């Protein structure tokens, strides 16, 4: 973004960060995953339910298979400050509207976590949704409208925002 293009309504911001752990089964494994998520994010997790049955994985429809936490505002920024240095971000991680996601293979990579043989090792997925002011126009109930193409986030805008805000390198 050049100096001429700068306007406060074009300044990107983080709408939400979703941290997800897919366990594939309920019971003790899911309870352990929920505890880990709550320790890492500092927020209570919500169980995710399977949408359809899969005989190959032994999962029935409506069965709990994972846990997730949605972070917004300052807690989302604080979480990203600890999670982004762990992750290897590349431009291919970003979609055409500037959202991006990354995975953390082991929860023990977070500074607050240590390996515990009773718990084991869990991986997690992080999805970040970036928006600009004015995006509510698309989501509101009355008189909702499309966001003009000139105001939509691009991959370049998102990469520049992440690199400048969190001081991380995004690989090509």
From Swiss-Prot:
This is one of the proteins that bind and probably mediate the attachment of the 5S RNA into the large ribosomal subunit, where it forms part of the central protuberance. In the 70S ribosome it contacts protein S13 of the 30S subunit (bridge B1b), connecting the 2 subunits; this bridge is implicated in subunit movement. May contact the P site tRNA; the 5S rRNA and some of its associated proteins might help stabilize positioning of ribosome-bound tRNAs. Keywords: Ribonucleoprotein, Ribosomal protein, RNA-binding, rRNA-binding, tRNA-binding. Belongs to the universal ribosomal protein uL5 family. InterPro entries: Ribosomal_uL5, Ribosomal_uL5_arc, Ribosomal_uL5_C, Ribosomal_uL5_dom_sf, Ribosomal_uL5_N. GO terms for biological process: translation. The keyword Cell membrane does not apply. One of its GO terms (molecular function) is rRNA binding. Part of the 50S ribosomal subunit; contacts the 5S rRNA and probably tRNA. Forms a bridge to the 30S subunit in the 70S ribosome. Coiled coil: none annotated. Pfam families: Ribosomal_L5, Ribosomal_L5_C. Signal peptide: none annotated. GO terms for cellular component: ribonucleoprotein complex; ribosome. It comes from the Archaea. HAMAP family: Ribosomal_uL5_A. The gene is rpl5. This is Large ribosomal subunit protein uL5.
């Amino acid at each position: 973004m050049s100096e001429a293009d700068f306007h406060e309504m074009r300044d990107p911001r983080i709408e939400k960060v979703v941290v997800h752990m897919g366990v594939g089964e309920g019971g003790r494994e899911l309870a352990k995953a929920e505890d880990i998520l709550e320790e890492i994010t500092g927020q209570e997790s919500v169980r995710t339910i399977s949408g359809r049955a899969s005989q190959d994985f032994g999962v029935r429809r409506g069965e709990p298979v994972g846990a997730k936490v949605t972070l917004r505002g300052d807690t989302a920024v604080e979480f990203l400050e600890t999670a982004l240095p762990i992750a290897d971000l590349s431009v291919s991680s970003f979609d055409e509207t500037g959202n991006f996601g990354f995975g953390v293979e082991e929860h023990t990579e977070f500074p607050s976590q240590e390996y515990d043989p009773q718990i084991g090792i869990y991986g997690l997925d992080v999805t970040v949704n970036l928006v600009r002011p004015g995006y509510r126009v698309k989501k509101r109930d009355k008189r909702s409208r499309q966001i003009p193409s000139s105001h939509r986030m691009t991959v370049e805008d998102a990469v520049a925002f992440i690199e400048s805000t969190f001081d991380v390198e995004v690989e090509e």
